[in-house]
């Protein structure tokens, strides 16, 4: 599904778990102001190296997603392609609380994660039901596409 075609991407974008950083770099090339974060220092170093010769609206930061206090209400769009389902179950609540903190009432959050209905991919990850509960508890509205 192409998020650009849906018209749901807005000016200030957070790419959560941004490795390999192609989404952040692509959106920045289209004029979006993008912050890419990843807990991996190596991933951020690679991202910075790739963009060092580019003039773009992207900043990469090595951060724990649950500690983004300075971004209160800042992001119009959050994209998570595989980060949320990779974290420990005990980190789901801090993650979704952070989502609630960094978004405003009109923000869009796009979260792609494994589902328990996809048996070929489902292993130790929790499925969409658990994700939905964590999002709901932290007042992150769910939109199914």
Curated annotation (Swiss-Prot):
InterPro entries: Methyltransf_25, SAM-dependent_MTases_sf. Gene3D superfamilies: Vaccinia Virus protein VP39. Keywords: Methyltransferase, Transferase. The keyword Magnesium does not apply. It comes from the Eukaryota. One of its GO terms (molecular function) is methyltransferase activity. Its EC number is 2.1.1.-. One of its GO terms (biological process) is methylation. Belongs to the methyltransferase superfamily. Probable methyltransferase. This is Uncharacterized methyltransferase C750.03c. It comes from Schizosaccharomyces pombe (strain 972 / ATCC 24843) (Fission yeast).
